[in-house]
Amino acid sequence: MNSSSSNEKNGKKISPVFIYSAIIAAIVVLIGAIFPTQFDSVTNEVKMWITDKLGWYYLILTTIIVFFCIFLIFSPIGKLKLGKPNDKPEFNTISWFAMLFSAGMGIGLVFYGAAEPMSHFASPPDADPKTTEAYTEALRSTFFHWGFHAWAVYGVVALALAYAQFRKGEPGLLSRTLRPILGDKVEGPIGTFIDVLSVFATLVGVAVSLGMGALQINGGLNYLFGVPNTTWVQAIIIVIVTILFIASAWSGLSKGIQYLSNLNIGLGALLMIITLIIGPTVLILNMMTSSTGSLLNTFLFNSFDTAALNGQKREWMSTWTLYYWGWWLSWSPFVGVFIARVSKGRSIREFISGVLLVPAIVSFIWFSVCLLYTSDAADE
């Protein structure tokens, strides 16, 4: 009996989605390794084409998703439970917040915590650089990028997966959420294509996050211990982080991932609180409040603003806003699967409210603390 027949008999048949995704990923990595300069040039050209030709679509899509989430919170649909009527949440609320926050943002908040608002302060889209107005503009822009749009995208994908999985008994595959539209075609080549596309998009999102994390860790090691800031060191860091992630995932949600998420959110909260106390506390709170008001006041305009006749701002949007919208969309299959898995037993209203509001508010506080503490230290 050959190995393929043996695997099928033992229920270990390798999924076509895995095979196709692995082949595509290997080809892309191989091309990038052999032709790094050309690969970088081509991917940049593709990015520029997407942001130039499809930027309007990204803005409309993500904004519709935000308002769809708001509709779900206040509609009767919100009463539906993600699971059977007697199902209870598997994780307590604090651990649930910790896990979805760690999966959704993680290293991004650390990497961009001070860097992004400081960049906007030095070169704001709608204010004079390094002025009082630039502070508010910097935080408003950062809140906009890391706030409701990002978490609405995550929330809708996670909700679709959770509903299909826990109420309809479907596997946790993105293709199966489209059964009401595609019918049984989701079990054929069309479904495989959708799942391969979502896996590849996830790989791209993971690559960005791992790359940023490696740069951040390498920078810290270089500053503290003089470890060389090189590609090889960053590759080793990525390997170590990947091994730790696999070990955590292997130990299960209720052990490794839950404990790591709680530790992650605990250390992050401790760092944020200490920084808030030793920094310009009142100024941080005042600026956070003002910038939140500015965000809400300009929310609709900025959600649809394509800067069609403003070349400088359009270039800024390509670098920041549209880049983020693409990043959140590419990351959403992975984050959505995880959030769906840990949210069984919660109502749709509770689910959307928690996913949309809590992480966004925490992000606002984090960025306010990072910007004002960093700029205050720089002034001194």
PLM feature spans:
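Hydrophobic alpha-helical segments and their helix-loop junctions in multi-pass secondary transporters
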Residues: 27-39, 63-78, 207-220, 224, ...
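Membrane-water interface regions at transmembrane-helix termini and the short interhelical loops
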Residues: 6-10, 35-50, 69-88, 140-145, ...
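Conserved small/polar residues in nucleotide/adenosyl-binding loops
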Residues: 373-380
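Selective recognition of specific alpha-helical transmembrane segments in multi-pass small-molecule
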Residues: 22, 99-108, 198-209, 235-250, ...
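Hydrophobic alpha-helical transmembrane segments
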Residues: 62-63, 137-157, 307-331
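Helix-loop-helix module between adjacent transmembrane segments
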Residues: 11-12, 16-19, 24-33, 66-69, ...
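N-terminal alpha-helical transmembrane segments of multi-pass membrane transport
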Residues: 2-134
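Juxtamembrane inter-helical linkers in multi-pass membrane proteins
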Residues: 125-133, 174-190, 291-307, 375
